[in-house]
């Protein structure tokens, strides 16, 4: 990777010609609101979100895959997991489960963060390698205070018997320095669906953070942050196992320099380290004993950093680096003995080193980045033991793919970039953009090695995959049309070498494998807002279509037309709202692996909510979700493998009364 540093050095000696500049924030590109959503969490969390993925459903165009009561997996424009780059206070997070129990957003306990930023698609190159679906960034924003500030809160949800207690305090250490402590604890039981069943959806989480920061003499800011997240006994009816525990330690150091340094007018430096230890089994919560008992300890450890320098007020250049190590061991009870089966993730190390440049002017924005990605397993040939069902990862790859397929170090040279033209149109702001995004396949897609004596339970990566290449054209508009405030976008994404999962020989009873195909994804998002007789009326609509062009079939896990219609009355101290959440029928699916092999019915579900602020420091909220106690599931929800039997999705919760109280002093 040494050649990257030479290229990086050349970028940093570029002379910039003088031109009329726009105001640019180094941490976030300037763009139309159709492509970026920067939200205060307390403003969009109207129903006590259980985690970051659940919270994101409040943003138009973001859906979620439900596998249980916690760990909701966000989907943006038909893309999820490693097609989204997710940051927690600047730290890039990779989950520790190949079955996606713990998408990165599940480690964001929303009571402990201040804001979330969502960028849809490739509209910036500042946020790491890949991420063709978009960027999700949860942030805490802390500044010096003159006296201690306290906030305490209590949330409840009647259906699952869920209670969350949270607290936040900021202490002044001097006129420029501060100490912030915050934390939360949640316990939830099994929620009841509209049909009256209670799937295994209970969970327990705790989270706390320590932040120490100071303003330096030139106004620059230095901050260190430690976060601890603990999840215990998290049930997943949509998976074969549950979380026994998942423990996360996260460290970040941030330096934002506001005074010039050489050619740079400002500079951001961020370093991070995240360690996740995770144990899943089918014994702790399901009571499985004897033969068939399974447990899998895993880990995902990531460290890295980024340096971004602003040249003038309209250009940013930088470098970022990530190093992730994933390990997982597959174990099973046989003949009354614990048997080590194989390395599910065979000690895989993934490194990403990128350089980038991004520029904004009054009417045009563009960016370019180059990433060198190296992914290498280290235990692909570990001795498999004496039993016939035990194989080394390399033996398993060769067993399920044609020819001799073995794991080796993979290197990818990826180029991504975008160009966006902004223009005033019809009393509003419009844009059109063209982007290219190359994403290297992840650890699971390349080297997963789950074996089983039952063929369809095998889940095997493909060491010979190529990088995806997304080419997207997008257009958007924000302004007034026919008395409505409109915010919308349309997009068309053509993908070469899209990584898809499939069944061996296209047989639903055979192993789950991976391959590259050509694919297209296209759709739209639109928000219309209007004040009618003192009632704020907001309509959100989003639609995505995904096609596997190589196999002439739909892509899996694509949400149909969906949205919500909200009526809200607001005053200085109160708000009252009624919301209709709805989705169309989805009859386009690929039932071989991820989708259930039948269509999903449409639905309409009704919520009411209200908020009260009797004093500036005290706020109450109360509401009821799914008022009619309707049984429904979104098309994205995983199959319920415990209660409901074959071809039945994990249902959404039934009727629930929820509320919160927050007091600041």
Label each residue range with its predicted role:
Residues 360-365, 371-373, 480, 485-591, ...:
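Gram-negative outer-membrane beta-barrel transporters
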Residues 188-190, 194-195, 199-205, 219-267, ...:
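Flexible loop and strand-edge segments within Gram-negative outer membrane beta-barrel domains
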Residues 92-120:
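Short acidic/polar hinge/loop motifs at secondary-structure boundaries
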Residues 137, 145-147, 153, 164, ...:
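Periplasmic-side early beta-strands and strand-to-turn transitions of outer-membrane beta-barrels
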Residues 239-265, 297-302, 344-350, 400-418, ...:
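Outer-membrane beta-barrel signature, preferentially recognizing the C-terminal barrel domain
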Residues 43, 52-55, 72-75, 87, ...:
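N-terminal periplasmic accessory domains that precede
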Residues 21-55, 73, 81:
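N-terminal periplasmic "start-of-domain" segments of outer-membrane beta-barrel proteins
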Residues 491, 496, 584-589, 611-665:
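C-terminal beta-signal and adjacent terminal beta-strands/loops
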């Amino acid at each position: 990777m040494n050649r990257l540093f030479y290229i990086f050095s050349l970028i940093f000696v570029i002379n910039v010609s003088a031109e009329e500049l726009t105001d640019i924030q180094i941490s976030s590109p300037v763009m139309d609101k159709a492509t970026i959503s920067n939200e205060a969490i307390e403003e969009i969390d109207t129903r006590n979100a259980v985690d970051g993925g659940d919270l994101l459903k409040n943003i138009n165009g973001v859906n979620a895959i439900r596998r249980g009561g916690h760990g909701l997996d966000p989907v943006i424009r038909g893309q999820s997991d490693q097609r989204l780059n997710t940051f927690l206070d600047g730290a890039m997070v990779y989950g520790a489960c190949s079955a996606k129990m713990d998408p990165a957003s599940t480690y964001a306990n929303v009571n402990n963060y201040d804001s979330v930023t969502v960028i849809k698609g490739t509209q910036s190159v500042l946020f790491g390698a890949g991420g063709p679906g978009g960027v999700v960034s949860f942030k805490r924003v802390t500044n010096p205070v003159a006296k201690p500030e306290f906030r305490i809160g209590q949330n409840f949800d009647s259906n699952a018997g869920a209670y969350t207690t949270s607290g936040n305090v900021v202490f002044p250490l001097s006129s420029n320095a501060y100490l912030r402590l915050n934390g939360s604890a949640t316990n939830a039981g099994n929620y009841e669906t509209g049909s009256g069943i209670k799937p295994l959806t209970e969970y327990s989480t705790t989270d706390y953070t320590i932040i120490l920061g100071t303003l330096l003499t030139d106004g620059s800011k230095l901050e260190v942050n430690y976060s601890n997240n603990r999840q215990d006994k998290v049930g997943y009816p949509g998976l074969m196992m549950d979380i026994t525990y998942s423990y996360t330690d996260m460290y970040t150091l941030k330096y934002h320099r506001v005074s010039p340094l050489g050619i740079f007018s400002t500079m951001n430096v961020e370093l991070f380290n995240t360690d996740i230890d995770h144990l899943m089994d089918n014994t702790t919560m399901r009571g499985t004993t004897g033969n068939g008992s399974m447990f899998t300890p895993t880990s995902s450890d990531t460290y890295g950093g980024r340096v971004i320098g602003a040249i003038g007020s309209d250009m940013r250049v930088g470098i970022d680096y990530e190093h992730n190590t994933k390990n997982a061991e597959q174990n099973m009870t046989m003949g009354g003995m614990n048997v080590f089966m194989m390395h599910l993730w065979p000690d895989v190390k993934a490194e990403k080193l990128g350089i980038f440049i991004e520029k904004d002017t009054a009417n045009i924005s563009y960016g370019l980045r180059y990433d060198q990605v190296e992914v290498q397993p280290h235990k692909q040939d570990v001795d498999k033991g004496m039993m016939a069902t035990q194989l080394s990862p390399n033996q398993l790859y060769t067993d399920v793919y044609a020819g001799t397929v073995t794991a080796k170090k993979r290197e990818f040279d990826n180029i991504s970039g975008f160009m966006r033209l902004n223009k005033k149109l019809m009393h509003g702001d419009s844009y059109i953009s063209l982007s290219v995004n190359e994403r290297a396949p992840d650890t699971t897609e390349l080297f997963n090695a789950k074996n089983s004596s039952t063929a369809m339970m095998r889940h095997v990566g493909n060491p010979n995959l190529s990088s995806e290449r997304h080419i997207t054209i997008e257009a958007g508009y924000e302004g007034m049309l026919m008395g409505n405030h409109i915010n919308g976008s349309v997009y068309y994404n053509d993908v070469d070498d899209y990584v898809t999962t499939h069944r061996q020989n296209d047989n639903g009873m055979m192993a789950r494998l991976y391959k590259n195909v050509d694919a297209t994804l296209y759709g739209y998002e639109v928000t219309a807002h209007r004040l009618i007789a003192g009632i704020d009326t907001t309509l959100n609509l989003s639609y995505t279509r995904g096609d596997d062009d190589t196999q002439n079939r739909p892509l899996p896990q694509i949400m149909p037309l969906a949205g919500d219609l909200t009526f809200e009355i607001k005053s200085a101290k109160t708000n009252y709202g009624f919301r209709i959440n709805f989705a169309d029928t989805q009859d386009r699916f690929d039932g071989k692996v991820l989708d259930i092999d039948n269509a999903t019915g449409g639905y309409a579900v009704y919520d009411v909510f209200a908020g009260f602020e009797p004093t500036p420091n005290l706020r109450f909220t109360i509401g009821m979700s799914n008022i009619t106690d309707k049984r429904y599931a979104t098309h994205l929800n995983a199959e319920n493998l415990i209660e409901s039997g074959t071809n039945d999705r994990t249902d959404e919760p039934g009727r629930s009364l929820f509320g919160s109280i927050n007091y600041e002093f």
